[in-house]
Each structure stands twice: as structure tokens, then as C-alpha cells.
């Protein structure tokens, strides 16, 4: 796996699924391929994206700044600086300075990532802030190691939270989670269906599923009534894709 592929993988792991994630993936690919060289326009686009947390925007802004060649005097962006200040906690800043001194001695991506993983997310963000604000310099490879360590920590906590939700025994949360998944699956089906005649059936199924979820939420239903809803939808989607000659390996 190349370095840039690894960076893209880690960064995308902290972006919530949805159309925006696909857009960000495309932007990252373009940047890494040297196709997008307008850093200012890229940062303006990033700043106005909805849904993303300030820290995720800060990390993406840091990655874009590291990768896109820019004029020396280009202004640093406030939204990135604010996201990478470790919540203004002096403790984070002290640790960030210690980490920075260690990173200065590293020359490889993996070495830097290994060192960084033993620090808290706040300290890692502050250290990125130091580098972003030109208070310190490290090689691009080392900076990417720092980015990936931060993303790994964030993804770990997101995974833990997700696992807790999936394994919860609370029937109301499970019920709502199944309805949300069914609704987003239906939306994906509608987007993938396109406008061909064969798509009409898939569109109909998706539309019915969304109406059903809406009705279930409106009138309030027994928590077990949503069981199997998403799986039924996926079966329909796979059948439709088979007819269209599209092989879908795994969607669940």
C-alpha cells in the first residue's frame, strides 16, 4: 500500500458515510494525483461543508495544506487553527511540544505514527496545530504519520460507540437503528437505480420502505416490527442488480 493510499484510508475512516464522503474521497484522490492545485478554493469548499466535525475539517485542511503546493505567504485558515488548538487546554499544548520534539527525530511515516499513538487525541491535534501554524517543521512523511495516528484514535472511539449501539439490549434503540438503516438503504437504492425501465421496481420497493418507516415513526410501533426491514430491502436491491448485470459482493 502506498503512503498516500494509507493516508486516504485513515482520513476517510473518520468521515461519516454519505454523499459528502464520496465527494471528499474524490477531492483527496485529485489532490494526491496533483490534479487539484488551488489550495484556497479547496479550503473554502471544505470550510462550508455541513455535517463534518470541526476536528475532521481541521485534519482535512491540514492534509490539503501539506499536499497542495502553495505560495509561501498564503494565509493560514482560522477554522483549521481553531480545530487544531487542543481545545485550548495548556496540558495538551505541553504534551504536543514534547511529541513534536520526538517527531523531529523521526524520519519515517510508520516511526512517526508509532510514536504519536501513545498520546491523547487532544495532544495530537495540538501538535498538528503547531506544524500548521509554522511554529515547527517536520517532513511531510512524518506529518502524515501524525495525521494517521490521530485518525486511528478517532476511528477507534467511533467504532467503540458504534459497537455499543449495535450490541445494546435496549429495544427502542435497536428499533430506531433498524429504521434508520432501512431508510438510508432505500435512499441508496433510489440513487443507484437511475432512470432505466428495470429500475422502476427497485425504486418502488425503496419508496414503499421509506413510506413504511415514516408511518412507523408517526404512529409509534412495537420495537420488534422493524426486524428484517433492512435485510428485505437489501435482497430486493441485490435481485435488481443481478438483473442489471451488476455484481454486488457485500452491502450489509
UniProtKB/Swiss-Prot annotation:
One of its GO terms (molecular function) is structural constituent of virion. Coiled coil: none annotated. Pfam families: Flu_M1, Flu_M1_C. Residues 1-164 are annotated as: Membrane-binding. One of its GO terms (cellular component) is host cell nucleus. GO terms for biological process: viral budding from plasma membrane. It is found in: Virion membrane; Host nucleus. A motif (Nuclear localization signal) lies at residues 101-105. Plays critical roles in virus replication, from virus entry and uncoating to assembly and budding of the virus particle. M1 binding to ribonucleocapsids (RNPs) in nucleus seems to inhibit viral transcription. Interaction of viral NEP with M1-RNP is thought to promote nuclear export of the complex, which is targeted to the virion assembly site at the apical plasma membrane in polarized epithelial cells. Interactions with NA and HA may bring M1, a non-raft-associated protein, into lipid rafts. Forms a continuous shell on the inner side of the lipid bilayer in virion, where it binds the RNP. Determines the virion's shape: spherical or filamentous. Clinical isolates of influenza are characterized by the presence of significant proportion of filamentous virions, whereas after multiple passage on eggs or cell culture, virions have only spherical morphology. Filamentous virions are thought to be important to infect neighboring cells, and spherical virions more suited to spread through aerosol between hosts organisms. This is Matrix protein 1. The gene is M.
Amino acid at each position: 500500500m502506498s503512503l498516500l493510499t494509507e493516508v486516504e484510508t485513515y482520513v476517510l475512516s473518520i468521515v461519516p458515510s454519505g454523499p459528502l464522503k464520496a465527494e471528499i474521497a474524490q477531492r483527496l484522490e485529485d489532490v494526491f494525483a496533483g490534479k487539484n492545485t488551488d489550495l484556497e478554493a479547496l479550503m473554502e469548499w471544505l470550510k462550508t461543508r455541513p455535517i463534518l466535525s470541526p476536528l475532521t475539517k481541521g485534519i482535512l485542511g491540514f492534509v490539503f495544506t501539506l499536499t497542495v503546493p502553495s505560495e509561501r505567504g498564503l494565509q493560514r485558515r482560522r477554522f483549521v487553527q481553531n480545530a487544531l488548538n487542543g481545545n485550548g487546554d495548556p496540558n495538551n499544548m505541553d504534551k504536543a511540544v514534547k511529541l513534536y520534539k520526538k517527531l523531529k527525530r523521526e524520519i519515517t511515516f510508520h516511526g512517526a505514527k508509532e510514536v504519536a499513538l501513545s498520546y491523547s487525541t487532544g495532544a495530537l491535534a495540538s501538535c498538528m496545530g503547531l506544524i500548521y501554524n509554522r511554529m515547527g517543521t517536520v517532513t511531510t512523511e512524518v506529518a502524515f504519520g501524525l495525521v494517521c495516528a490521530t485518525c486511528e484514535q478517532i476511528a477507534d472511539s467511533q467504532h467503540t460507540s458504534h459497537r455499543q449501539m449495535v450490541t445494546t439490549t435496549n429495544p427502542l434503540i435497536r428499533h430506531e437503528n433498524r429504521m434508520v438503516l432501512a431508510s438510508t438503504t432505500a435512499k441508496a437504492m433510489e440513487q443507484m437505480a437511475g432512470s432505466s425501465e428495470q429500475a422502476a421496481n427497485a425504486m418502488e420497493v425503496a419508496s414503499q420502505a421509506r413510506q413504511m418507516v415514516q408511518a412507523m415513526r408517526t404512529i409509534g410501533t412495537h420495537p420488534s416490527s422493524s426486524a428484517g426491514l433492512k435485510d428485505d430491502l437489501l435482497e430486493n436491491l441485490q435481485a435488481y442488480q443481478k438483473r442489471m448485470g451488476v455484481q454486488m459482493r457485500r452491502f450489509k
